[in-house]
């Protein structure tokens, strides 16, 4: 039960971020948005390395496998998985009028929420598979280390929640409705985490693959969406600074608590 509440921490980050719609103006300043996008990227990159890929390598070594094989295969499968989802699920990215995925008649609002929801899937998997490793007691993953990842994801979810709810508000949606949709986009994280824990507890031999799989999926989101959006237009250096800050904070969290 205690772990269940910890799994809700990332979702809480999304909810608090979406809640900024009640406190701020209808639009986020472009410089702040770039900083937040860069920050989220930095957190996810650091989490992928220290909380997922490194434990994947360690666990593979403990299992007597060639350490780089599970990490490499799982990472590439994670990239391919998100690539397939990206091409199948109808969604619309922020600041874009061109929907991606299979053609549909879904509302613009729904497709915007689906875009963020799609990117939250690997984050939920990452938290779930890390807790599974901690529960099993392999790869040097501790509950504290898994909690560090959950906190890190929650921190980067805060700007994501704001970045989805604020544009919805600026398009005329009520604050309460914008908050609801912003929060809804993060619900897949605890669900994905719980499902991943239930699955990985019975498939210990492939846990190194699952750890690196989650890392690959997260890096896909960073490279495909977050970094390009943070670098578009003027003041791209602000996004770069955000990446550095997010990376260092997540690294400190993982080393201090892990």
List where the protein language model places each region.
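Intrinsically disordered, metal-sensing/regulatory segments
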Residues: 1-258
């Amino acid at each position: 039960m205690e772990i269940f509440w910890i799994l809700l921490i990332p979702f809480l980050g999304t909810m608090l971020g979406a809640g900024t719609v009640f406190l701020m103006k209808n639009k986020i300043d472009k410089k702040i948005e770039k900083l937040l996008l860069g920050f989220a990227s930095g957190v996810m990159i650091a989490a992928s390395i220290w909380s997922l890929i490194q434990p994947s390598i360690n666990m593979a070594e403990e299992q007597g496998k060639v350490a780089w094989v599970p990490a490499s295969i799982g990472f590439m499968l994670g990239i391919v998985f998100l690539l397939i989802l990206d091409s199948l699920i109808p969604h619309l990215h922020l600041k874009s009028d061109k929907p991606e995925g299979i053609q549909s008649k879904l509302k613009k609002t729904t497709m915007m929420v689906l875009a963020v929801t799609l990117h939250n899937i690997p984050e939920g998997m990452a938290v779930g598979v890390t807790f599974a490793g901690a529960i099993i007691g392999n790869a040097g993953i501790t509950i504290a280390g898994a909690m560090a990842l959950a906190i890190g994801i929650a921190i980067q979810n805060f700007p994501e929640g704001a970045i989805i709810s604020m544009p919805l508000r600026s398009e005329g949606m009520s604050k309460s409705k914008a908050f609801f949709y912003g929060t809804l986009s993060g619900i897949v994280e605890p669900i994905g985490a719980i499902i991943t824990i239930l699955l990985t507890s019975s498939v210990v031999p492939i846990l190194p693959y699952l750890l690196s799989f989650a890392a690959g999926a997260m890096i896909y989101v960073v490279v495909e969406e977050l970094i390009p959006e943070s670098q578009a237009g003027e003041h791209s250096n602000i996004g770069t600074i955000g990446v550095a800050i997010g990376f260092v904070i997540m690294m400190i969290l993982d080393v201090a608590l892990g």
